[in-house]
Amino acid sequence: MGMIGSGLLLIDKPGGWTSHDVVARVRRLAGTRKVGHAGTLDPMATGLLVLGLNSSTRLLTYIVGAEKEYVGTIRLGAATTTDDIEGEILERAEPAALAAVAESSIAEGIAALTGEIEQVPSAVSAVKVDGKRAYARVRAGEEVVLPARAVTVSAFRLLSERREQDAIDLEVRVVCSSGTYIRSLARDLGARLGVGGHLAALRRTRVGGYDVRRAHELATLEPAAALIPATEAASSLFERLRLTEQQATDLAHGKRLHLAGWEGPRGEPVAAIAPSGSLVGLIEFRGKEARTLVNFPADEIA
């Protein structure tokens, strides 16, 4: 194991970096190979990337599916091959067509893409098609058509609008379920308005309860100082159960707990905390019995 303990790091990813670039940098800085992330950000995007270090990579499973918040710029007036600014332009709208797009039409288009919707992911995405990433198939020259899937856009707000002759830039804020593509929202809004659209800029501002304002810049990152210890991380994600010494020992050895008085959630993870304050593991209650979902090595936990 490296010099650093187990926990989460909140990184403010710079533009131009892949999520894997960030993981590779943190591996070097932290001196451990055991680094993973809770959801990819496109290279063009900036903002919050949640990393797990050492045994806390096991927590990432429970963060990947969390609600996300973004701010971004949707550019109306052109459709692109990737649904973002990095793709080749497929078609441009005439200035007259753009000028005819009413603010009320934009509001109606946004409303139609809010709530529980069926969304077709961008062809240049990390969605797997027969075991191979869609973007890899596109780069190999294949035609990729992905099926629509259900996503939830719980908020889609227009923050500001800027009109030019060849484009309308919409600054937006989106709160959505995991698996929602903001690029696809840009594409679909442009298509609804008949002028084409793509994503010109994107910043992820929140993942679950973690806000980008708590995130650290890579350029000045000191992993040990920035680390959210595993116990603190799990306590902010889940309900907590304080164990006795005997219960902590039993759980660490894989035994099930029998707790008649538990009144917390059932069928979802609970953070099991030892009397010392360290995280023993994640457990799940079924009836009066608790089974271990994830164990955490005692020597790693801060």
From Swiss-Prot:
Keywords: Isomerase, tRNA processing. It comes from the Bacteria. Its EC number is 5.4.99.25. It catalyses: uridine(55) in tRNA = pseudouridine(55) in tRNA. One of its GO terms (molecular function) is tRNA pseudouridine(55) synthase activity. One of its GO terms (biological process) is tRNA pseudouridine synthesis. This is tRNA pseudouridine synthase B.
